[in-house]
């Protein structure tokens, strides 16, 4: 995560968003994996919903890298889902965010780009207006050998969702459209917010429902295109859901603490 490569990556991502026709905001992030005095940024895109309120979905991925496992490739998924949804109206607002300082060791700290964004957005629109945060985890960069056709078992285990007990309902809302498109339900794991290690952690600790999506297929695999489509369909559906009014839904629509 050297500043020069981070700056080049930020410029590349911002340029891609701009080319799609989005207005781009650069949110400063400091410390963490970056040398003192270097300027790095979260790259934010806001897609307004049809409803004139603050209810929003956050879709994010970090663009810095800390090795093979956390390689920043989630940003490619972020860009492709943003591209796929550019001209599709949704009821709720969507924030697409490419995070700086998402890789270890800064990823768990207050200098994480996700921590900066979660705190700022919840402060401006209120955490309860963030209906959920979807974290797009990086994929392996290569197959690491001969490509094998995955059997039924491999396919079942190929996509993993991680959520929190509080995010169970949101994860279910995400899994349904994803499974319809992917033709296979993701395997879902539950973790306490403090046990999360990704960008989602910083939203979950604020009581925001989260789901982190991970594909075991490498970036170069033919199924990655289908994975992108399933994610796009999922985000579209989630951002289009009608949120029930708490008053009409006593006991179920209560704000969780």
Predicted regions: what they are:
Residues 2-6, 22-30, 89-94, 185-194, ...:
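Surface-exposed patches in mature extracellular/periplasmic domains of secreted proteins
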Residues 1-48:
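A non-catalytic alpha/beta surface segment that caps or lines the substrate-entry region
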Residues 4-24, 73-80, 112-116, 120, ...:
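Extracytoplasmic/secreted proteins, especially bacterial periplasmic and envelope-associated proteins
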Residues 65-169:
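Acidic/histidine-rich catalytic neighborhood of metal-dependent amide-processing enzymes
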Residues 27-29, 47-49, 60-64, 97-102, ...:
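Active-site-proximal beta-strand/loop segments in catalytic clefts of secreted hydrolases
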Residues 139-254:
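Active-site-adjacent substrate-binding region
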Residues 1-7, 30-34, 62-71, 84, ...:
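Second-shell loop/turn segments in exported
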Residues 20-22, 53-57, 90-95, 126-132, ...:
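Loop/turn elements at helix/coil->beta-strand transitions in domains of secreted/extracellular proteins
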């Amino acid at each position: 995560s050297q500043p020069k490569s981070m700056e080049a990556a930020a410029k590349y991502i911002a340029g891609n968003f701009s080319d799609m026709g989005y207005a781009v905001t650069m949110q400063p992030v400091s410390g963490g994996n970056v040398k003192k005095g270097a300027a790095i940024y979260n790259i934010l895109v806001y897609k307004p919903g049809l409803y004139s309120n603050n209810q929003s979905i956050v879709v994010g991925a970090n663009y810095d890298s800390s090795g093979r496992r956390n390689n920043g490739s989630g940003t490619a998924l972020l860009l492709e889902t943003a591209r796929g949804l550019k001209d599709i109206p949704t009821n709720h607002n969507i924030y697409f965010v490419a995070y700086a300082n998402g890789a270890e060791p800064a990823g768990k700290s207050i200098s994480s780009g996700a921590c900066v964004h979660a705190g700022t957005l919840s402060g401006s629109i209120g955490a309860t207006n963030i209906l959920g945060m979807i974290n797009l985890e990086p994929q392996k960069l290569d197959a690491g050998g001969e490509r094998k056709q995955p059997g039924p078992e491999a396919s079942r285990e190929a996509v993993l969702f991680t959520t929190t007990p509080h995010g169970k309902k949101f994860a279910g809302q995400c899994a349904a459209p994803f499974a319809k498109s992917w033709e296979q339900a993701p395997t879902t794991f539950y973790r306490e917010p403090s046990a999360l290690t990704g960008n989602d952690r910083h939203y979950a600790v604020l009581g925001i429902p989260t789901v982190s999506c991970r594909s075991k297929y490498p970036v170069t695999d033919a199924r990655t295109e289908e994975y992108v489509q399933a994610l796009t369909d999922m985000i579209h559906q989630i951002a289009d859901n009608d949120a029930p009014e708490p008053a009409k839904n006593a006991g179920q629509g209560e704000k969780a603490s």
